[in-house]
Amino acid sequence: MIGQHLLADLYDVASDRLVDAGLLADCLDEAARRGGMNPIGPPVLHRFEGGGLTGYLLLSESHIAFHTYPEHRYIALDIFSCGGGDSKAALSVFLAALEPGREHLTTAPRGAEIPQRD
């Protein structure tokens, strides 16, 4: 196995938080730090006409990325680590900052058919 991909669907998030680029950029940085992951550059964010944001942070272990839909009070969050990072600790940063009313989490093994290295 290459790594774990944590997919988080966060619902019922205050719309103003989902358009706050500063807050979400800080979440990316803090999530990497808390998860013991190593950024290879600064967070990158793009704002769309409707106010939604897409952002990502490239990591030496892979990436953290999100897409916000403020009109639906929803954020899709991906945390993929092919190293020793703690994806759940990284997720906790977003949960604390965004305070979703509901969440749906899925963890997917990536490269499951590839033998683990020693």
Where are the predicted features?
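Polybasic/polar functional segments that serve as interface/processing modules
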Residues: M1-D118
